[in-house]
Amino acid sequence: MLQSIHLRFSSTPSPSKRESLIIPSVICSFPFTSSSFRPKQTQKLKRLVQFCAPYEVGGGYTDEELFERYGTQQNQTNVKDKLDPAEYEALLKGGEQVTSVLEEMITLLEDMKMNEASENVAVELAAQGVIGKRVDEMESGFMMALDYMIQLADKDQDEKRKSLLEVVKETVLSHLTKKCPPHVQVIGLLCRTPKKESRHELLRRVAAGGGAFESENGTKLHIPGANLNDIANQADDLLETMETRPAIPDRKLLARLVLIREEARNMMGGGILDERNDRGFTTLPESEVNFLAKLVALKPGKTVQQMIQNVMQGKDEGADNLSKEDDSSTEGRKPSGLNGRGSVTGRKPLPVRPGMFLETVTKVLGSIYSGNASGITAQHLEWVHQKTLQVLEEIAY
């Protein structure tokens, strides 16, 4: 997969000059033949099959994030002008460290005895060896630079370069995960488990104390023991952090975290009125209440389901608000406050968020059950809750 990678890094410009920033240009070649390499080979591997051109760093953000952050599409020069010196320096250091890691991997791979069948394993072993001893020294800009390199490889439709960089990223994440508390490790495992039944089985084994298990493909998997309440609370904390931002950077991850929180709470067996699930809200969020009122006013069916799907995907009432706070324009804005009245807080509420919406549905259901109110409304809300989870399942995996 990887024969040689030659990396160049431009001279480090000062943030004030904002000269062209070049992250490591990678010259990748992947032409291993079936013949083995001799351990004591004296010549360096020189054949270069694919040249991956240099590219400028735009900050490691997607086009949507760049628009949110700078109010412009991905214009490289403008983005660099907007970067503050600390962020600019972090990018430089991160890029240099990616270069260093890949160079050290080459050193290990050059003298390895391998054939075409074992090259993928060899790359993974080299990544484990190099990153394992350097993970504690990783710069804050390392993952930002690596993510941007992967984005560009994907845009260039360069699967080999993308695959190599993803091996490095997965290895780094794996090492970082091992340093996390057990309930955080479990969330990482659940995010990579697409089948609902498998997630439930994983949660059961985690609640039982964890241990070593054999997966369907025969590989050994170590599952840590953790408290279900800790898992639900951690997922909820991550959700709150993501949902209070003006724009959601990754809706797929957001949907996975919502499912993890709801499934962990459901497995605790305390029901809707379980005090462990109480966030301590004194009032419910305006946007979610307005949207829920619309859904309850309509008969359950395809129309309501489509409304839920649109909002969960970030459309209609769930669309991210990228306008500035001081924008006086009222065109296209939805009314603030409950039922179109003025906002109680005087601030424009956030759009409808998946995690907060399900939290709102649960709170309203809890009030209905504790007050012995009409059963028809409760059934309607249960249906909304169920359909929302189905939609999030489709988005998440």
From Swiss-Prot:
Transit peptide: 1-52
Assigned keywords, A-Z: Chloroplast, Plastid, Transit peptide
Full protein name: Protein PEP-RELATED DEVELOPMENT ARRESTED 1, chloroplastic
GO cellular component: chloroplast nucleoid
Phenotype of gene-disrupted mutants: Seedling lethality due to deficiency in chloroplast development.
Lineage of the organism: Eukaryota, Viridiplantae, Streptophyta, Embryophyta, Tracheophyta
Transmembrane segments: none
Keyword Transit peptide: yes
Subunit structure: Interacts with FSD2 and MRL7.
GO term, biological process aspect, one: regulation of DNA-templated transcription
Superkingdom of source: Eukaryota
Organism of provenance: Arabidopsis thaliana
Gene of this entry: PRDA1
Compositional bias annotation for Basic and acidic residues: 315-334
Signal peptide: none
InterPro entries: PRDA1 (IPR038961)
Main location: plastid
